[in-house]
Amino acid sequence: MAVPKKRTSKSKSRSRKAKWKQKAYNAYIKCVSLGKSVISGKSKSFIYIQQQTEKNL
């Protein structure tokens, strides 16, 4: 027989939402930091293959 579920409290739902937002913010900070290091050329976690190609027109 189907039984209705109890309602989730506001504090629990807000806590879950805050946790999700914090995880997203941490991922954003990590991405921005990595992007800055790649742009500045100080990144140690990537191997850059520099190819010089010449096009004869």
Swiss-Prot record:
One of its GO terms (molecular function) is structural constituent of ribosome. InterPro entries: Ribosomal_bL32, Ribosomal_bL32_plant/cyanobact, Ribosomal_zn-bd. The keyword Ribosomal protein applies. GO terms for biological process: translation. Disulfide bonds: none annotated. GO terms for cellular component: chloroplast; large ribosomal subunit. It comes from the Eukaryota. Keywords: Chloroplast, Plastid, Ribonucleoprotein, Ribosomal protein. The keyword Nuclease does not apply. SUPFAM superfamilies: Zn-binding ribosomal proteins. Its main location: plastid. It is found in: Plastid, Chloroplast. Belongs to the bacterial ribosomal protein bL32 family. HAMAP family: Ribosomal_bL32. This is Large ribosomal subunit protein bL32c. It comes from Gracilaria tenuistipitata var. liui.
